């Protein structure tokens, strides 16, 4: 079995299930830490800051620091800064994306911004959509942190960022650049942070459509763990198979 020098790890469904602890995840990450294998938690959640994400992981007894968290907000801000280092950005979104924009030396703009970024915004208003549409029509480049149409909550499935993004797409006729999983952009950014090559990095996740496809799109090896969204019975012959598939992260510990 191939030994990997770095791990990119999904959160919900892989490290925990909502508010429920996954015991095997704790042992898995502790083993990575004890053996000195670098790892980075990669999430499509654009609303939380790295510290907030790390604090939640620690509450589940999973070893994590904010430096070991890579959010779609961070990937989005870095992507924009690479395009134009002093760009102005009109942001629809919450604390996570706004903090990432500031930390990358970008400024906030309005109808004449260089970029429009859409992240999940649970206080969305018509005016926010209106300014975003006007900026795009004025030539702003259109970026979306991720295309998740719905997000699971205790109440059930609620509108995700892809749903918000679609309002601007339909109104302007402009398709955004998506950053988060299953796109390769967030994976490439994360590997730069981790400092490992694509051939020696493993993507670990529970959701075939986002986590595993992100790894496949980035040319990475993938490990599908059936503790969340995608069960064994969901896999069909016409789907590109993950490199590895397991029922519990405990099964992978001997290969770390």
Swiss-Prot record:
Induction: Cotranscribed with the two upstream genes, yutD and yutE. YutF overproduction increases the level of yutDEF operon expression, and this up-regulation is enhanced in the presence of inorganic phosphate.
Pfam families: Hydrolase_6, Hydrolase_like
Class in the EC hierarchy, top level: hydrolase
Reactions this protein catalyses: a ribonucleoside 5'-phosphate + H2O = a ribonucleoside + phosphate; XMP + H2O = xanthosine + phosphate
Keywords in alphabetical order: Cytoplasm, Hydrolase, Magnesium, Metal-binding
Stretches that traverse the bilayer: none
Free-text disruption phenotype from the record: Inactivation of the gene has essentially no effect on cell growth in rich or minimal medium but results in a drop in pNPP hydrolysis in the crude extracts of B.subtilis cells to undetectable levels.
Source domain of life: Bacteria
EC number(s) recorded for this UniProt protein: 3.1.3.5
Necessary cofactors: Mg(2+)
Key word Magnesium present: yes
GO cellular component entries: cytoplasm
Gene3D superfamilies registered for this protein in UniProt: HAD superfamily/HAD-like
GO MF annotations in UniProt: metal ion binding; phosphatase activity; XMP 5'-nucleosidase activity
Compartments, record wording: Cytoplasm
Family: Belongs to the HAD-like hydrolase superfamily. NagD family.
Described purpose of this protein according to its UniProt entry: Catalyzes the hydrolysis of various purine and pyrimidine 5'-nucleotides, showing preference for 5'-nucleoside monophosphates and exhibiting the highest catalytic activity toward 5'-XMP. Also shows a relatively high phosphohydrolase activity toward the nucleotide precursors ribose-5-phosphate (R5P) and 5-phosphoribosyl-1-pyrophosphate (PRPP), and toward the non-natural substrate p-nitrophenyl phosphate (pNPP).
Quaternary organization: Homodimer.
PANTHER family documented for this protein: 4-NITROPHENYLPHOSPHATASE-RELATED, HALOACID DEHALOGENASE-LIKE HYDROLASE DOMAIN-CONTAINING PROTEIN 2
Full protein name: 5'-nucleotidase YutF
Lineage: Bacteria, Bacillati, Bacillota, Bacilli, Bacillales
């Amino acid at each position: 079995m191939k030994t990997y020098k770095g791990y990119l790890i999904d959160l919900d469904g892989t490290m925990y299930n909502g508010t429920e602890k996954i015991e095997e995840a704790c042992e898995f990450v502790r083993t990575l830490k004890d053996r000195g294998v670098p790892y980075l938690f990669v999430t499509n959640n654009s609303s939380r800051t790295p510290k907030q994400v790390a604090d939640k992981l620690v509450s589940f007894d999973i070893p994590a620091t904010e430096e070991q968290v890579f959010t779609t907000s961070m990937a989005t801000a870095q992507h924009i800064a690479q395009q134009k280092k002093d760009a102005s950005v009109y942001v629809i979104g919450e604390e996570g994306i706004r903090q990432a924009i500031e930390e990358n030396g970008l400024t906030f703009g309005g109808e004449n911004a260089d970029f429009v970024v859409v992240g999940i915004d649970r206080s969305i208003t018509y005016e926010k959509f209106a300014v975003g549409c006007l900026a795009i029509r004025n030539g702003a480049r259109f970026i979306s942190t991720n295309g998740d149409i719905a997000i699971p909550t205790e109440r059930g499935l609620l509108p995700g960022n892809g749903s918000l993004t679609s309002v601007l797409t339909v109104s302007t006729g402009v398709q955004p650049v998506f950053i988060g999983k299953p796109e390769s952009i967030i994976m490439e950014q994360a590997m730069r942070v981790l400092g490992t090559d694509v051939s020696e990095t493993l993507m670990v996740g529970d959701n075939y459509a986002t986590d595993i496809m992100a790894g496949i799109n980035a040319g990475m090896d993938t490990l599908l763990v059936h503790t969340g969204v995608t069960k064994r019975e969901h896999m069909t012959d016409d789907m590109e198979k993950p490199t590895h598939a397991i029922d519990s992260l405990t099964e992978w510990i001997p290969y770390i």
